[in-house]
């Protein structure tokens, strides 16, 4: 896109407009300034609320993918890419899943997590190549993230995923974006102009984080990664998480600490298995068989 055409496109984007509520922020005290930011931030959950139907639709597609051996893949550039990588990296310790189940891709690669990479987002072919590098297939779900809704890198990835017949989802902060025209499911969190004109790491980034939280949390809950609201598949990989696993077993079963610790030891720190053993009064092997029969869904295994 030529510089003239790009300027024209940017001038039409809500995320590139000047915010009338922040015109004088360079004259405000610290308290006045953070009040303005806070007031603007209140619009973010309201914008996300308007997209709940689309978010739920995406969750259903992600669940189907997981159940059929597929993955959730995030792709973005800059802040959008970093948020995708962040959300993906939280899934293994929180839900005990493989690091391959939810994948985050950022334009420019690992270095781009900490440093700006000039021009990394400007090439559609690089977006396609990034998916090919992780063997993206029809079984997977692609979530393209870009506040502008026009990032070439993300568009290239969405077009490639769509050509394979995979489910495609876009997350943008401008309505009717180029990404939305490609994606099967368009999540347009229109949060309005930023406090700092064009600084989409702010409200737009916050909206993206809220949506990503919903996508992975709801999907993991629906495939049985929690019991009530407890993280029963948590990986007890450090002292804090080991203590949390004990607490989870105690709360789920109403047992004392000694029972929880002893059962967790037998269950090799698997909180879900320990809970199953205690509540079904069964040994480790029987509890494992019951959970396997019900695809790891603890509540269903206990009921049946």
From Swiss-Prot:
NCBIfam families in alphabetical order: N-acetylmuramic acid 6-phosphate etherase (TIGR00274), PRK05441.1 (NF003915), PRK12570.1 (NF009222)
InterPro entries, A to Z: Etherase_MurQ, Glucokinase_regulatory_CS, MURQ/GCKR, SIS_dom, SIS_dom_sf
Quaternary structure, from the entry: Homodimer.
Signal sequence range: none
Gene Ontology MF terms in the entry: carbohydrate derivative binding; carbon-oxygen lyase activity; ether hydrolase activity
Additional information: A lyase-type mechanism (elimination/hydration) is suggested for the cleavage of the lactyl ether bond of MurNAc 6-phosphate, with the formation of an alpha,beta-unsaturated aldehyde intermediate with (E)-stereochemistry, followed by the syn addition of water to give product.
SUPFAM superfamilies the UniProt entry points to: SIS domain (SSF53697)
Annotated SIS domain residues: 62-225
HAMAP family in UniProt: MurQ
Catalytic reaction list: N-acetyl-D-muramate 6-phosphate + H2O = N-acetyl-D-glucosamine 6-phosphate + (R)-lactate
EC number: 4.2.1.126
A Pfam family it matches: GKRP_SIS_N
Active-site residues, record numbering mapped to chain: 90, 121
GO process annotations (BP): 1,6-anhydro-N-acetyl-beta-muramic acid catabolic process; amino sugar catabolic process; N-acetylmuramic acid catabolic process; peptidoglycan turnover
Protein name: N-acetylmuramic acid 6-phosphate etherase
Entry similarity comment: Belongs to the GCKR-like family. MurNAc-6-P etherase subfamily.
Main EC class the enzyme belongs to: lyase
Gene behind the chain: murQ
Record's keyword annotation contains Lyase: yes
Lineage: Bacteria, Pseudomonadati, Pseudomonadota, Gammaproteobacteria, Pasteurellales
